[in-house]
């Protein structure tokens, strides 16, 4: 950014007056906590930064709108949980580069390319959404028989024209807490099918805790802790744990493309039909170095339903619940390795599969028709502990299947 004029403010009237007067690009330095703040718009080229412990507490559902080439840093921003604490102006074609650094919000962060907004770059480093509610945010991308809830953090290109491009570099994003998950999705990055594109160099997350608030048994709606839809990301890295708490709440979900996706902390779901990692997209290498564990009827561990993944590596996969399949693959893939076993603890039950409720046994390792792999290697055993549930089902094909540590079906009649 260009050199900015400095201006320090410590009251609502000083802040609103300065923004209304405009003038040359200015870095507004905020001191203290300002309450009952009306809606604010940051002029092009301006920055808003906080001195230690600075905060903006907005009135009602008001928030901060960014225009072009803005930077917001070292601030806490509070609004209604279902409102946008930070949003982008959709009345201009290009937002330039928007920078969000070291921020905490109550309320959503929603950078949405719609209206006139067609291009720009978003850079985020250290953003924590403490509380937000995206359950009613619209529109929602749809496919595979379901629609996807937006997230506490949302980057979404809604343009119909594929020439529209939003680029991004997103690091140190986090949302919610174990005792206070955000509602709706967690981290949501999306383009539009056949239309506006999102291309991100990095999507790095810390701890994410989300609860979609979807009624159990719903067949046409899902959410995710980290969800990439019709967008391309060179590197996804989940440095912190990702935990979902509700029905149909996928922990990690991909409908787009990623060169490399790495998860280095536990992936956990605690609701029915909530999958640990599900892919309908394309990944070069998927590496999960911490446990995947699900607790809920139909909460499968890992699925490939469309697209392909070349290299797949998991630490371990454990499920607890009827119909909670451990690994289920129905498309071509390269090599799958699980280093410390696949274990299921459940029988036959109902689960959501591509927009329909189906009955499935909690098989530990299932290669469906359409699965065609180079190799499957599992150390630490494959076990299904449910009554009448087989440990392994191979209806597809794999050139090399190697399981060490035993294959065990614990229930009678398995």
Question: What are the residue ranges of the model-derived segments?
Answer:
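Extracellular beta-strand-rich solenoid/capping regions of secreted or surface-exposed proteins
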Residues: 20, 35-49, 55-97, 107-118, ...
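Mature, well-folded catalytic/scaffold domains that follow N-terminal targeting or propeptide regions
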Residues: 251, 276, 301, 326, ...
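Short beta->alpha connector loops
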Residues: 13-14, 32-35, 54
